């Protein structure tokens, strides 16, 4: 079951968001370091999903920019509001195709309605 993986992701996300005010606004790790950390061969056997999520969070840590934090003034990329983050998680979970109504009626309808606000 994926519950443990989702709980692990939620715990890492919560910890990240709670620490935004204290996080460095510039990622301390460079491209080479991140490639070395995140690269390498794929596992030959299945892995525990929760362990994969935890490992990803650990390896990506030095390459994360605190763009949603209160001290970030680099680019106007905005921050992720809690409701938007949760909605994004649901959208990824539902995995709907908004291209055709028959493939994802709710997603297609939300996409059509969002055009009103553009």
Task: Please provide the spans of the model-predicted regions.
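Glycine- and acidic
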Residues: 94-102
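N-terminal glycine-rich, Lys/His-bearing helix-loop that initiates the first secondary-structure elements
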Residues: 1-90, 106
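Conserved small/polar residues in nucleotide/adenosyl-binding loops
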Residues: 116-118
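Conserved pre-motif C helix in the palm subdomain of viral-like polymerases
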Residues: 102-109, 113
